[in-house]
Curated annotation (Swiss-Prot):
Gene from which the chain derives: TTC34
Name of this chain's protein: Tetratricopeptide repeat protein 34
Organism ancestry: Eukaryota, Metazoa, Chordata, Craniata, Vertebrata
Keywords, in A-Z order: Repeat, TPR repeat
Record-linked Gene3D superfamilies: Tetratricopeptide repeat domain (1.25.40.10)
TPR repeats mapped onto the chain: 50-83, 178-211, 212-245, 306-339, 341-373, 424-457, 464-497, 512-545
InterPro entries in UniProt: TPR-like_helical_dom_sf, TPR_rpt, TTC34
Region of interest: Disordered: 1-29
Signal peptide: none
Organism: Homo sapiens
Source organism, top-level taxon: Eukaryota
Entry-linked Pfam families: TPR_16, TPR_8
């Protein structure tokens, strides 16, 4: 009957309901009088009944008779000096009366007792203002303990004591305990009780989803639990809301933890930038808010890291703020003058100004060093800009190849491939360049991509030449069997063109000999159809080759009963 509703700040409907249930001040005073009379009668029947004594004290408190309440509680305390329900009531009462030293001693005894089960029903009796006094006192006491906390094992003892005070403050505050919950969560984190700390941070965030300190705290707990992605997500959310709070928090971390978080934030932004629509259109403000917050925070944490300046430059370019991006690129180049990544970004800015050859010159330096980074940069361009860039790069590559400079041409070749979206003509150009550099494996991979494309009606001659190139590369790698297969495909698609190409390289006699060896091998393994194909292909190259003619006759004899020759 004496307990307050635990709800703080009731709505109008709730207020009407509570008024109906408890009545106005006069009704409440009448209830308290009745409770006091009943408790007094119970004490007369049983003088040892402590519950009745506490009930009487609570009724006196509700009636505003604080001196009598104090006396009644002192009697109860004399009977049970360590009783938590009595200590809690006396502490609240002494705070209300202004006797802070006595209140502090009582709270200290209550903390030492470790009995908190009684607190909620006890505190429900007291008015909101008195509960606030207890919360403020306990919270301040906990902070004082933490400020004076020594190192080592004694520090853990002090932290546990602070947790006890904070728990009292949380009980007293009810739903308005965010500061105490945050402080207690940090204490649990200090003690290594990560999941308990997480519980307190989550409690705060359920009530205040935008609490920046709680987001930061929970992020650090996630980090301690090896949940890097969750930690990064919380930090990003916090940075959107209050970067001024987050940055000092991150700068205070140990180097190892700070490196994990900053690298995670960097990777997060890079992943988002790589997912941009492939249109080159500037991002809207809502899309760049989080990216900008992270980019600016990384520079505030460590302005000497060139990668952070490059990231912010990319974000600004994605937003369309090219002049501001140029400022950060100059800072990155000042710290790393030979950075291909920074020069490539300057090239992108040149392209935006219309200098396509200059852009190609700066961008090609990154093509062979960090192709994924260059691909992300090219996402920031419009389709027409990428097309112009691919053409300019291919033209310069062709000039360098004609001049006998394949090493200098390679970057331009790779730039043309990336800017064109791996167009077949640019892949062929790079394969030629790589072959001159004797990087046969890479050249072969480029041709494989070309050969995987769908074949148009008028593309047979070109496809035949691609197979001839593939075969030559396979020969350079020592795979004669696969080379023979590629040459056979070319002869099947365009016999005349393939004959002329193979007679030039590797030459009529070497090609015929290769088909002869291939046919003999297939025949020994009883693969008659493949042997026949090899012989027929070889005779297309050299119709008068005696060895191929003899092998053809032998295949006929051995398979005279089969129908596979038809």
């Amino acid at each position: 009957m004496l307990q307050r509703s635990p709800r703080a700040g009731p709505s109008r409907a709730q207020g009407r309901r509570e008024a109906a249930e408890t009545g106005g001040p006069t009704t409440q005073e009448g209830v308290a009088c009745g409770v006091h009379q009943l408790a007094t009668l119970l004490m007369e029947l049983d003088s040892e009944d402590e519950a009745s004594r506490l009930l009487a004290a609570d009724a006196l408190y509700r009636l505003g008779r604080l001196e009598e309440t104090h006396k009644a509680l002192l009697v109860a305390l004399s009977r049970r000096p360590q009783a938590a329900p009595v200590l809690a009531r006396l502490a609240l009462l002494q705070l209300r009366r202004g006797f802070f030293y006595d209140a502090n001693q009582l709270v200290k005894k209550l903390v030492q007792s470790g009995d908190t089960a009684c607190l909620q029903p006890t505190l429900d009796v007291f008015c909101h203002e008195d509960r606030q006094l207890l919360q403020g006192h306990c919270h301040a006491r906990a902070l004082a303990i933490l400020r004076a906390r020594p190192g080592g094992a004694d520090g853990r003892v002090h932290t546990k004591e602070a947790i006890a005070y904070l728990s009292l403050a949380i009980f007293a505050a009810g739903s308005q305990a965010s500061e105490s919950l945050l402080a207690r969560a940090r204490c649990y984190g200090f003690l290594g009780q990560k999941k308990t700390a997480m519980f307190d941070f989550n409690t705060v965030l359920r009530a205040e989803p935008g609490n920046v300190q709680a987001l930061c705290g929970r992020a650090l707990v996630h980090l301690a639990l090896d949940q890097l992605q969750e930690a990064v997500d919380d930090i990003v959310s916090a940075l959107k809301l209050g970067p001024g709070t987050v940055v000092p928090e991150l700068r205070s971390l140990k180097p190892e933890a700070q490196a994990l978080i900053t690298q995670g934030l960097y990777s997060h932004c890079r992943a988002l930038l790589s997912q941009l629509p492939d249109t080159g259109a500037p991002l809207e403000d809502k899309d760049t808010q989080g990216l900008l917050a992270v980019g600016e925070a990384l520079i505030k944490i460590d302005s000497g890291q060139p990668h952070w300046h490059l990231l912010l430059a990319d974000i600004l370019m994605a937003q369309g703020s090219y002049e501001e991006a140029g400022t950060h690129l100059e800072k990155a180049l000042h710290r790393a003058p030979t950075s291909e990544a920074a020069r490539a970004r300057l090239g992108l800015l040149q392209l935006k100004k219309g200098d396509v050859p200059g852009a190609a010159r700066d961008l090609q330096s990154l093509a062979e060093v960090d192709a994924p980074d260059l691909s992300c940069l090219l996402h920031l361009l419009e389709a027409s800009e990428r097309q112009s860039l691919a053409q300019a790069a291919a033209q310069e590559a062709g000039t360098l190849l004609d001049a006998g400079q394949p090493r200098q041409a390679l970057g331009y070749c790779s730039l043309s491939v990336l800017a064109s979206g791996s167009s077949a003509c640019h892949l062929r150009l790079r394969a030629t360049c790589l072959a001159e550099l004797q990087e046969f494996g890479r050249a072969l991979r480029d041709l494989d991509h070309v050969l995987q494309e769908a074949l148009g009606d008028g593309d047979l001659p070109r496809r035949a030449e691609d197979f001839c190139r593939q075969g030559r590369l396979l020969l350079s790698l020592g795979d004669e069997a696969a080379a023979a297969g590629a040459f056979a495909q070319a002869l099947k698609l365009a016999p005349s063109l393939a004959q002329n190409s193979l007679c030039r390289q590797p030459g009529r006699a070497p090609t015929a000999r290769m088909f002869l060896l291939r046919g003999q091998c297939c025949l020994e393994e009883q693969r008659h159809a493949e042997a026949w194909t090899a012989v027929e292909s070889g005779l297309l190259v050299d119709p008068d080759h005696r060895g191929l003619k003899r092998l053809k006759a032998r295949i006929r004899r051995e398979a005279s009963s089969g129908c596979w020759l038809q």
